[in-house]
Regions:
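Active-site neighborhood of HAD-like aspartate-dependent phosphohydrolases
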Residues: 1-50
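C-terminal cap/substrate-recognition subdomain and adjoining C-terminal extension
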Residues: 2, 76, 83-227
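Conserved active-site and cofactor/substrate-binding residues in soluble primary-metabolism enzymes
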Residues: 17, 69, 157
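Active-site phosphate-binding/coordination module
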Residues: 18-25, 71, 135, 152
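Acidic/polar active-site rim loop that often engages polyanionic ligands
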Residues: 19-22, 58-59, 141-147
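Active-site phosphate/ATP/adenylate-binding loop shared across adenylate-forming ligases
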Residues: 50, 62-66, 140-141
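Metal-dependent phosphoesterase signature
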Residues: 57-92
Length: 227
């Protein structure tokens, strides 16, 4: 049986939300309008934490930030974003957890609702070879259209995308001893689908579910979220 270690990114391995931080970063650089995107970004984060935003609206809003420039123009931005914003927010406890699973010869997979363009450098930085993320639509010139593509990797979609990823390798979840680390009630479907769910820095709703179901709770940074 394959040992699978699945990791959500935002508020789990990362102390923060990479979508929200990306918007803030682009606003600070003058790429996005502070009045428009700043308010919408803050509201989207609140709605996501409450579990009240639709998967389509959430993913579409953040992917839309990539429509402002040609794809090649984003490379310098995302490299700076990784170095200046993301890497400092991934603490030693998260890195030690990843290393422990490597030492156990587990197959490491990052699964995130955030789009691939933003998160693939983070996965590489952490030495996670496999990434399941929301995909971005490209036009004929290979530039971002500002729309997500295919099945969104959020809520039930995380289960479906994982199953599809496993099927490409001739596997099913039944073939795996799977552990999944997540902070969010939005990931309840995948947490319930694996053998070893771990509520990690859980939001209030997930903490309540974890207590009810007897799931372990792990703190990787700070004292955990309360909203």
């Amino acid at each position: 049986m394959i040992r699978l270690a699945l990791f959500d990114l935002d508020h789990t391995l990362l102390d923060g939300d990479s979508d929200v931080l990306w918007c803030d970063f682009l606003i600070e650089r003058g790429v996005l309008d502070a009045t428009d995107f700043g308010a919408r970004n803050a509201q989207m984060e609140r709605d996501y934490r409450a579990g009240s935003v639709s998967t389509q609206d959430f993913c579409a809003f953040y992917v839309s930030t990539l429509a402002a420039r040609p794809r090649t123009a984003w490379e310098a931005f995302r490299l700076e974003f990784l170095d200046a914003v993301i890497a400092p927010r991934i603490g030693p406890a998260a890195r030690a957890l990843l290393q422990r699973h490597r030492d156990d010869d587990d197959l490491l997979v990052m699964t995130t609702a955030t789009n691939r363009f933003i998160t693939e450098l983070t996965a590489g930085h952490l030495g996670i070879e496999h990434l399941i993320a929301t995909e971005c639509e490209l036009d004929a010139d290979r530039n971002f259209t500002g729309r997500p593509e295919g099945m969104l990797n959020m809520r039930d979609g995380k289960v479906d995308r994982l199953q599809a990823w496993l099927a490409q390798r001739g596997l099913t979840l039944a073939d795996c001893d799977a552990t999944f680390y997540s902070d969010s009630i939005n990931d309840l479907a995948l947490l319930a689908a694996v053998q070893r769910p771990v509520a990690t820095n859980p939001d209030a709703q997930l903490a309540a579910v974890a207590a009810e179901r007897g799931w372990p709770v792990l703190r990787l940074h700070g004292t955990g979220r309360t909203a």
